Amino acid sequence: MKEILQTIIENLVDDKASISINEIEGEKSIVFEVKVAEADMGKIIGKQGKIAQSIRSIMKAVSAKEHKRVSVEFLD
């Protein structure tokens, strides 16, 4: 799942080297903490958070196969 998130993020940002994704896995859930360059943060979040919400929706759909709850957090 991390690879899918990585691919999505890489296609949205200019500074691919600054991408950092931390995966915290629990018993029934996974939390992804995403950090990108400050200049790219707006591209990840989008107008009114629509891109961020779309990323979260895609990850929830992917996680349904593994029967785990996924949360994606975008950190400054």
List each model region and its residues:
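Residue-level recognition of oxygen-bearing side chains
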Residues: K50
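RNA-contacting regions in translation and RNA-metabolism proteins
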Residues: M1-K43, Q53-D76
